[in-house]
Swiss-Prot record:
Pfam families: Ribosomal_S5 (PF00333), Ribosomal_S5_C (PF03719). Part of the 30S ribosomal subunit. Contacts proteins S4 and S8. This is Small ribosomal subunit protein uS5. The lineage of its organism: Bacteria, Pseudomonadati, Pseudomonadota, Gammaproteobacteria, Vibrionales. The gene is rpsE. GO terms for biological process: translation. Keywords: Ribonucleoprotein, Ribosomal protein, RNA-binding, rRNA-binding. GO terms for molecular function: rRNA binding; structural constituent of ribosome.
Amino acid sequence: MAKEQQQATDLNEKLIAVNRVSKTVKGGRIFSFTALTVVGDGNGRIGFGYGKAREVPAAIQKSMEKARRNMFTIALNEGTLHHAVKGRHTGSKVYMQPASEGTGIIAGGAMRAVLEVVGVRNVLAKAYGSTNPINVVRATILGLTSVKSPEMVAAKRGLTVEAISE
């Protein structure tokens, strides 16, 4: 249990969006709040969560818990991506490509938060279509999980890394 707590504390947490939503009932409207968060270790692990509650802090806490339970591992290359990649979820499309050292994170909104917590320091990225934060986060994570390192490609093809890079 102590090791699990230690692991959870060294994660970077970012709140992307808080939204007030309502349910209409016979007596009027019932308001509640939703929160979208991402957590990452800055070294290739990332998770996202979406929580809903009657109060904002409770919604944020729920989404953070879901994000910690829903972690993915991304193959990074010294603070950038191995190759250009596209991601798509419903109406949101994202394109990300590696950038040279010193470029920084050139991305907007929800995509920037995802790239910061996962540990990408240099990337060029663009979101097309719907900019709904939930869909952009999902599209970005789908794109990042499809990144393959040269070692992964070599293992899959049964070749050496040198043979692939020629």
